[in-house]
Amino acid sequence: MALQKFPLLGLLFLITIVVSSTIAVDDPVCPTTSKLSRASFPNGFVFGTATAAFQVEGAINETCRGPALWDIFCKRNPERCSGHNADVAVDFFHRYKEDIQLMKNLNTDAFRLSIAWSRIFPHGRKEKGVSQAGVKFYHDLIDELLKNGIIPFVTVFHWDTPQDLEDEYGGFLSENIVKDFREYADYVFTEYGGKVKNWITFNEPWVFAHAGYDVGKKAPGRCSRYLKGCEDRDGRSGYEAYLVSHNLLNAHAEAVEVFRQKVKGGKIGIAHSPAWFEPHDLKDSNDVPTVSRVLDFMLGWHLDPTTFGDYPQIMKDLLGHRLPKFTSSQKAKLKDSTDFVGLNYYTSTFSNHNEKPDPSTPSWKQDSLVAWEPKNVDHSAIGSQPLTAALPVYAKGFRSLLKYIKDKYANPEIMIMENGYGDKLKDKDSVEVGTADYNRKYYLQRHLLAMNEAICIDKVRVTGYFVWSLLDNFEWQDGYNNRFGLYYVDFKNNLTRYEKESAKYYKDFLGQGVRPSALKKDEL
């Protein structure tokens, strides 16, 4: 109401939110508090929730949105999406104002969203048409966030390649994607860069390349027939994932070049998604080095080029001609092409030296000479895994990973773009069962504490944290069977949202302390 009555004050409020949306904590000072809360973190620390366009928006036939890779993947192979699709998803497209009120209820500062490429360019390229209705939707969404005091963090690409580009030249298998992605990124930076200062070019490039083009678990489902479960699928494991990542990295560099010309005062990064690893046998001299080796293959694969300008040396040594080479000009563009390290952390496991891989059946996991083990040499599991949990819970690994990045990459600014707990409920489970998510509450408590220790004790420069996810949503090959939301979505009854116990905890946690939007500019 105040914004409507006093338009000048409203404008100043929006400007304040935009200006204060690029926040750095160079020398974190951690207050002493009686219990862990927002007040336990440095001034200016940003807390939020996250989603992705394909997973929540729905409305696939509105705004002239073109088909995306996952639309076709799930329709052609419904069994590979658990029989589900994202045609409606959780209907965020129509309910975003309602959902922004849920964000406000949580006391969050920020919201991470993604833009659907084919909602802007239905056919993948500007010359083939721009959907002005799609452009307007994201303007309206961003404006509504700002009006409610919530800082938008925007991901340019979250796995939803326009199907037209996939059909035309194979999407990210072709270097043609580099110029098309640059054009798309240029358009969204120009369109929204005056309002949005925090950007991610690519979400989880390791998962996108490995799961989509090496083991075939995610779209487009490509893998070699010698891999278990890939008998009837096209692809070339051990080759295509490296090519896809190479094109993705060059596309990132081109987009960042445009970004730094167009978005003044902004920050940009990539959201990486490594697990943490502990040696299978601490007394085995072959197992101990597997931690750094597998992290080079999982994290360094994309973080080394954007930091140092080239792939990790171990990848070059082990892959040989199968790893594409950057030109000198590409290296120059890639080096220092991120302003912060985006990190998505979920789980940890054990790493074991794999001494004798079969050279006739290459794959990403085999290439690193590392086997992943659920238990160590003493038959102990890593962390805990409740019965409904999708992944083991190991908060210590979160802190260890943060310290690893600090030490290896010269203490960069880090933003936790995703952290969350998935539980696989049964169809018969009631809303009451779904909202009593005490395991998720415990997960958040442990990981927020681990992050606080990394900041305050290890002096890691973490400046923001986003819970995955605001809402239960479409979880790729798991469909709607794997729930990560702070809010329960009743898929059987009008997609009604219900507050979970974890949401109540996060709201209480964030209710204690000063929000960044309430700080003076010189305090940020």
UniProtKB/Swiss-Prot annotation:
One of its GO terms (biological process) is cellular response to salt stress. A motif (Prevents secretion from ER) lies at residues 521-524. A beta-D-glucoside binds at residues 55, 158, 203-204, 346, 418, 468, 475-476, 484. GO terms for cellular component: endoplasmic reticulum; endoplasmic reticulum lumen; mitochondrion; plasmodesma. SUPFAM superfamilies: (Trans)glycosidases. It is found in: Endoplasmic reticulum lumen. It is an enzyme of class 3 (hydrolase). Component of the PYK10 complex, at least composed of PYK10/BGLU23, BGLU21, BGLU22, JAL22, JAL23, PBP1/JAL30, PBP2/JAL31, JAL32, JAL33, JAL34, JAL35, GLL22 and GLL23. This is Beta-glucosidase 22. It comes from Arabidopsis thaliana.
